[in-house]
Amino acid sequence: MTTLLLVHSSARTGGSRTREMADILTAEWHARGDNHQVRVVDLADTPPPHVDAATIRHFFGLAGAEEPATASLALSDTWIEQLLQADALAFAVPMYNFSLPSTLKAWLDHVIRPRRTFRKVADGELEGLAGPKPALVMTASGGLFADTSLDHLRPYMKTALAFMGIDSPRFVDWEGTARADIDPAAQRRTVTAQLREWVHAC
């Protein structure tokens, strides 16, 4: 069985371009055969809590870590297992105020965790433990921001994934959703071709 972990971070359940891209991706993934399954984590349905002091103590083995595990720690364990068990990763990420939604940032705060998804191998040296595996980041934005000084989404996602050992994520961008001069049908054809290409490369 080949499993794709798909993480939704759009607050919108309808009219979302990243959810539309995710639907296209899911259809392409399933078209590869019955042995291709998709596991979905929808952060709009279950918003991650912010990391609290007790959870940080458990993450880093600080004083007080012997206290009973928190519900937040249990969520972290679940999400990390899903991440580690997946054969490929896909993130549906709308750009909110030039960066990623806070729900996805909170999810990443729970999965970027010492001794689980990265470890210290020498003074100042760290090693990611969650890769290698293919990763896809599907973005949508009202303007044309990708790879400009206003784009804080792509650099952050690249850094966060690489820190866990997941290098060179593929980005598929549906840009200009608020612009009248950009044809959404043409955009859909372009992203569909790019998503199909990524699936077949996995």
UniProtKB/Swiss-Prot annotation:
It comes from the Bacteria. FMN binds at residues 10, 95-98. Pfam families: Flavodoxin_2 (PF02525). Its EC number is 1.6.5.-, 1.7.1.17. It catalyses: 2 a quinone + NADH + H(+) = 2 a 1,4-benzosemiquinone + NAD(+); N,N-dimethyl-1,4-phenylenediamine + anthranilate + 2 NAD(+) = 2-(4-dimethylaminophenyl)diazenylbenzoate + 2 NADH + 2 H(+). Its cofactor is FMN. GO terms for molecular function: electron transfer activity; FMN binding; oxidoreductase activity, acting on NAD(P)H as acceptor; oxidoreductase activity, acting on NAD(P)H, quinone or similar compound as acceptor. Homodimer. This is FMN-dependent NADH:quinone oxidoreductase. It comes from Alkalilimnicola ehrlichii (strain ATCC BAA-1101 / DSM 17681 / MLHE-1). The gene is azoR.
